[in-house]
């Protein structure tokens, strides 16, 4: 798909590392100019220099800062709503603050950014919105009520907006990865090891074994799917939830 996005501008939130960084590299490799947005400016700067993009530091839980970031971006052809957090707790330990924090970043911020940028895509007659949800958005897992709720919200938003956008030239889809080899998963492995007394290797293996393929997903596999959705030939893929977890949700 080299050159297929030449002349297009993409915005990737949570673009400094992990899945977001892999998607930013893939889009840039296809010719797009990429704006990478996130909270860790050093990571963003390194990636932006690597791909010839632009680093934008922004905390998406700050609505005023988010509005300013979106306004400065102007017209965007490809929007990848990737920024998110994952926290786990039992029901009684899921505080209002935790619930609000996860829902704000994982559901409300993507909605607000999409609402701001899609009208310009409609006017141009072409656009791609790719929401990075999770297989937790099509299933349920213990101790993750807030996270599952947020990712289900993202999937629901994707499906509803697909109806609204069906005749505009703008497509919207959700990618739903399982456990992906990222720093976020490294942090989850550490928490599991601390809580259960397992070694880090045992904790990591337990996550990998949730997939029938007995492995985690590479960030580049998610990036490949995102790039595919940006292609002309994918224009009929619309309002879909594409699960990338090695078959874990089938178990």
Task: Go through each PLM region and give its residues.
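Substrate-binding pocket helix/loop in short-chain dehydrogenase/reductase
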Residues: 90-91, 98-103, 207
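Active-site helix of classical SDR
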Residues: 114, 150, 158
């Amino acid at each position: 798909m080299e050159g297929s996005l030449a002349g297009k501008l993409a915005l990737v939130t949570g673009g400094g590392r992990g899945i977001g960084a892999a998607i930013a590299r893939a889009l840039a490799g296809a010719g797009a100019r990429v704006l990478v947005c996130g909270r860790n400016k050093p990571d963003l700067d390194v990636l932006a220099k690597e791909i010839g993009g632009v680093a934008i530091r922004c905390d998406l839980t700050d609505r005023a800062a988010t509005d300013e970031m979106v306004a400065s971006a102007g017209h965007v052809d490809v929007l990848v709503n990737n920024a998110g957090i994952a926290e786990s707790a039992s029901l009684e330990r899921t505080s209002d603050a935790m619930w609000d924090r996860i829902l704000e970043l994982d559901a409300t911020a993507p909605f607000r950014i999409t609402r701001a940028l899609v009208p310009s895509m409609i006017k141009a007659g072409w656009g791609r919105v790719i929401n990075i949800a999770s297989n937790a958005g099509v299933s349920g897992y213990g101790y993750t009520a807030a996270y599952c709720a947020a990712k289900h919200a993202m999937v629901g938003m994707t499906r509803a907006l697909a109806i609204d956008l069906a005749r505009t030239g703008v497509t919207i889809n959700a990618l739903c990865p399982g456990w992906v080899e990222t720093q976020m998963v490294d942090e989850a492995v550490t928490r599991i090891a601390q809580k259960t007394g397992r070694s880090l290797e045992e904790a990591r293996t337990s996550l990998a074994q949730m997939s029938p393929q007995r492995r985690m997903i590479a960030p580049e596999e998610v990036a490949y799917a995102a790039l595919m959705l940006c292609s002309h030939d994918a224009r009929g893929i619309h309002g879909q939830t594409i699960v990338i977890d090695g078959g874990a949700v089938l178990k």
